[in-house]
């Protein structure tokens, strides 16, 4: 009988337990007893909800100002550059008058 090498055991992934409930039934669907068809949003296009969510994600004016996408596709956080004392010489002048 052959034994499994120790190196094979290190690279095996354990199976994650699957959730008992794979999806949730929306409350609006359970409240409509007689209707065989689930209620739809006011717009006729089923992708309209998806499109509005996508616009919120892609909208560069409101969110993601502090994030930059590099050439490799990773998100890089833009860091604020602090003003130096050379640019603001009067920044700490009020401390000298207080005796500190």
Swiss-Prot record:
Q: Where is the composition biased (Basic and acidic residues)?
A: 53-62
The domain of life is Eukaryota
**Region Disordered: start and end of each range?**
26-100
Q: Which InterPro entries match?
A: PRR15
Read off the Pfam families from this record.
ATAD4
The UniProt entry's sequence similarity note says: Belongs to the PRR15 family.
Q: What is this protein's record name?
A: Proline-rich protein 15-like protein
Q: Native species of this protein?
A: Bos taurus (Bovine)
Its lineage opens with: Eukaryota, Metazoa, Chordata, Craniata, Vertebrata
């Amino acid at each position: 009988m052959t034994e499994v090498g120790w190196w094979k055991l290190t690279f095996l992934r354990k199976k994650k337990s699957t959730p008992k409930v794979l999806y949730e039934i929306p409350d609006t669907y359970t409240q409509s007893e007689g209707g065989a068809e689930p209620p739809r949003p006011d717009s006729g296009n089923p992708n309209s909800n998806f499109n509005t969510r996508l616009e919120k994600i892609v909208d560069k004016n409101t969110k993601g100002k502090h994030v930059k996408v590099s050439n490799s596709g990773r998100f890089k956080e833009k860091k604020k550059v602090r003003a130096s004392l050379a640019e603001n010489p009067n920044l700490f002048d009020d401390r000298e008058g207080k005796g500190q």
